[in-house]
Amino acid sequence: MAGTQDPSSLEEILWRSPSHVQMMGGYLHSNNILFYFAESPFFDATSNNASLAIQANYNEAFRHFVETREAFEARLKTMQGLEFMVAYDPLQAAAGANAQFVHEPSNVWVIRKQTRRKRSGFEDEVVVLATFFVVGDCIYMAPSAASVIGNRILSAVTSLTSLLKTASTLPKFTPSHGHTYLPPAPKSTDVSHPSVQSQTSKENTPMPDADATNKSQSFTGSQNSSGPAVYDMRSLAESFSLVARYGDEFMDESPLMGEPGSFILSRPGDADRGAAPKQSQPSSTNAGGRVGTPLAKVDTPGKLSDKNSAAEEPKLRKKKSKPAS
């Protein structure tokens, strides 16, 4: 029988002993499973199982307690302290199963390490300390819930730590895109759309021969694709519609007036004001001048003096007529 060991180290070991299985009849069953478990390092020599087995070896009155597992466990239930009990017997489970449910019998034994405390007038208080599995001739210790959760949390924290270390070097900052994990991809230009204009540098300017080749290729490509033709027809129809709707309107605040060569900037209300007087004035036709051309008025010095003298004569006549009245 093995002594006590650290429970944390027992979770990481597997124990098996084919020689003990051969000594116990070649296979494990309900009456020898606890004695096979007593040879493993998971067994505690200070338990009630060990003390009862020692008493049976030296006292014939206790011999019948070790002959069957039912008698052995019944004796353990009358004692108080640390004990090992079979919690699941695959042979009994297979024998007590429903005959209509056909299944293969399991070969997994479940043994519990527990403490029993007697209470007068009440049922015994049993506290489970550990659980063990016997699969074939291999014995395992079931991990505790705390160790399982701790290992899962440790695994998650380790993965997150490595992720944060990797992700801390990925972000890049640009004024146009801000913080990004991937470099910004250049925007793809759609050549088929008429509003998209390709901007080429002087270094990429093709030679004359290459230019002619590119033009021929683009011409053949435009004939094969119906997309540009549809956009061209739509643009042409929209242009005709705009001309028919707004062809007579001007966006200039001060429209030009006059003829070519003598345009004059006018205020918006000048055209309306000058329309009525021009209609009332009779149209004068001069044989010497061209139609629509303004005539320049030139006065000679001799004619100017005659006009002035003719204007002064009526004034003198009016002055003379006043005394007579």
Curated annotation (Swiss-Prot):
PANTHER family attached to this UniProt entry: MED-6-RELATED
Gene Ontology terms describing biological process: regulation of transcription by RNA polymerase II
Family note: Belongs to the Mediator complex subunit 6 family.
Basic and acidic residues bias spans: 304-315
One GO MF term: transcription coactivator activity
Record-given protein name: Mediator of RNA polymerase II transcription subunit 6
Top-rank lineage group of the source organism: Eukaryota
Keyword Transcription assigned: yes
Biased composition (Basic residues): 316-325
Subcellular location as annotated: Nucleus
Region (Disordered): 175-230, 253-325
Keyword annotations of the record: Activator, Nucleus, Transcription, Transcription regulation
Biased composition (Polar residues): 189-204, 213-227, 278-287
Role this protein plays: Component of the Mediator complex, a coactivator involved in the regulated transcription of nearly all RNA polymerase II-dependent genes. Mediator functions as a bridge to convey information from gene-specific regulatory proteins to the basal RNA polymerase II transcription machinery. Mediator is recruited to promoters by direct interactions with regulatory proteins and serves as a scaffold for the assembly of a functional preinitiation complex with RNA polymerase II and the general transcription factors.
UniProt subunit comment: Component of the Mediator complex.
Predominant place of localization: nucleus
Annotated Gene Ontology cellular component terms: core mediator complex; mediator complex
